[in-house]
Amino acid sequence: MTNIRKTHPLMKIMNSSFIDLPAPSNISSWWNFGSLLGACLAIQIITGLFLAMHYTADTATAFSSVTHICRDVNQGWIIRYLHANGASMFFLCLFLHVGRGMYYGSFTLSETWNIGIILLFTVMATAFMGYVLPWGQMSFWGATVITNLLSAIPYIGTDLVEWIWGGFSVDKATLTRFFAFHFILPFIISALVMVHLLFLHETGSNNPLGTSSESDKIPFHPYYTIKDLLGLMFLLLTLTILVLFSPDLLGDPDNYMPANPLSTPPHIKPEWYFLFAYAILRSIPNKLGGVLALIMSILILAIIPILQTAKQRSMMFRPLSQIMFWILTADLLTLTWIGGQPVEHPFVAIGQVASILYFSLILIIMPTVSLIENKMLKW
């Protein structure tokens, strides 16, 4: 008798995606982050749904409703902090996932990579709008500053900003539409994830060696289900420790003050996961130039496959490229630190140097180093 999981119309899709999927036998724990991101998305949708039951998207009551969730709703505080810190976990996994793709040459799977970039932009947009919802000081001023950047677009900029705001400043209309978008986007992300997986399963996964795995495959279950489960345990442990011991570690104290359009916080800054892009934005004195650099800091990922000059796919056996990759990692950490500092000497200068280095490494240095390695290997 044929197994039901192989014949049932719904089950056979699940079976071919998560059970009998032929996977390379040598993929390391760096390949866990896809499933961890799926887990993060599930946590965010579930906690977000429960928060939406008690939240009111109105400027007069938004801040109070979040306070009400934390104080009066059964286990409301844990749901709220799981959602806030879950976002941090989401981005941590995202950055590691993208870094893995760059290191091991997974960007050669161009459709999967490009859908991934669209996913990254969508998740960033969702997180930004979510940060506005508690209607604290940093929520309000963050929304004002970031949406105002669109006014740098020639000719249509000002009209575009007022159209997004739904008025002449960030107000009730802005909050209402941000809540609507913040609610719908995770479901769009879920659909994009399915497309991401669809394209991935067309080609099969890459592996640490960057070589073809066609001759050496093992079933996804039980080998990688168990391996992913271990990663999930570590993720949940980290998230639980963060939520139960220091839930406000990654937040901003200013957001515990209700939004006040008449009082600007001393340092307007986004959540930690946007700081690297914020530092690049601030390091350019021109407004339009800063906005373009901000967009390009993420969009540059799309041209990495074009810039690939190495004959070897993975960086595993390319020590010079490895050094450049870890310099890039250190540079991103430096930009993250700078983004959280005030706009004064020496932080401005450090930010400008780090921004130039970021673009130079990806556009010029890494492709050149790959060519040198080709010569050294006589390829």
Curated annotation (Swiss-Prot):
TM region positions: 33-53, 77-98, 113-133, 178-198, 226-246, 288-308, 320-340, 347-367
PROSITE patterns for this protein: CYTB_CTER, CYTB_NTER
Binding note for cofactor: Binds 2 heme b groups non-covalently.
Any one Pfam family match given in the protein's UniProt record, by short name: Cytochrome_B
Cofactor: heme b
Keywords (A to Z) from UniProt: Electron transport, Heme, Iron, Membrane, Metal-binding, Mitochondrion, Mitochondrion inner membrane, Respiratory chain, Transmembrane, Transmembrane helix, Transport, Ubiquinone
One Gene Ontology MF term: ubiquinol-cytochrome-c reductase activity
InterPro entries from the UniProt entry: Cyt_b/b6_C, Cyt_b/b6_C_sf, Cyt_b/b6_N, Cytb/b6-like_sf, Cytochrome_b, Cytochrome_b_C_euk/bac, Cytochrome_b_N_euk/bac, Di-haem_cyt_TM
Family of the protein in this entry: Belongs to the cytochrome b family.
Protein name: Cytochrome b
Biological source species: Microcebus rufus (Brown mouse lemur)
Gene this protein is translated from: MT-CYB
